[in-house]
Regions:
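An amphipathic, aromatic/His-enriched active-site/gating alpha helix that lines ligand/cofactor pockets
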Residues: 21, 52-62, 80-115
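Hydrophobic h-region of N-terminal signal peptides that target proteins for export
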Residues: 10-18
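Glycine-rich beta-strand-turn "strand-cap" elements at beta-sheet edges
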Residues: 4-5, 20-27, 64-71, 100-131
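N-terminal targeting signals for Sec/Tat export/insertion, comprising classic cleavable signal peptides
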Residues: 26-56
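Alpha-helix boundary/capping residues
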Residues: 11, 46-49, 94, 103-106, ...
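Short, well-ordered beta-strand segments in beta-rich or mixed alpha/beta enzyme
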Residues: 25-33, 62-91, 129
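Glycine-rich, phosphate-binding/catalytic loops in enzymes
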Residues: 5, 17, 94-96
Length: 131
């Protein structure tokens, strides 16, 4: 779990840093807990909306779902949008509305903290290593 959290944090910070010129970028790490009896169904909804959003929406930079290794009902989704406008547009799409309405009763807890990079200069190095 610690490695998963570190990887997610580094990804959030590095992508945010790479887009430093775009001060309006929105980065969130959704923290979701799902009722166990709905887990499989929830994961199906989440995977569909994440895939369709990244494929179809230019303003959706990243939707990266992860599942806790210790507790499979705990889901984290790294969300990165090009701007507040892109985020607001995403909320209005059919795939997101289907996900949101279809999973309301499945979600035990939801937090959507907005993230910001701790050290944008150092995080830029991650992209250089990936090339």
């Amino acid at each position: 779990m610690r490695q998963l959290a570190m990887t997610a944090a580094m990804l959030v910070l590095s992508i945010t840093a790479a887009a430093q010129e775009n001060e309006t970028m929105i980065v969130r790490l959704a923290e979701i807990e799902v009722y166990p009896q709905y887990l499989k169904e929830y994961l199906d909804y989440a995977n569909e909306v994440d895939r369709l959003s990244v494929e179809r929406e230019p303003g959706v930079v990243c939707l990266y779902p992860m599942q806790s290794a210790e507790d499979s009902t705990k889901i984290r989704i790294l969300e990165i949008y090009a701007s507040e406008e892109a985020y607001q547009q995403h909320l209005k799409t059919d795939p997101f509305q289907k996900y949101k309405q279809g999973t309301l009763h499945m979600v035990k807890d939801l937090k959507l903290p907005t993230m910001k990079p701790l050290d944008p200069e150092t995080m830029k190095l991650i992209f250089k290593k990936q090339r």
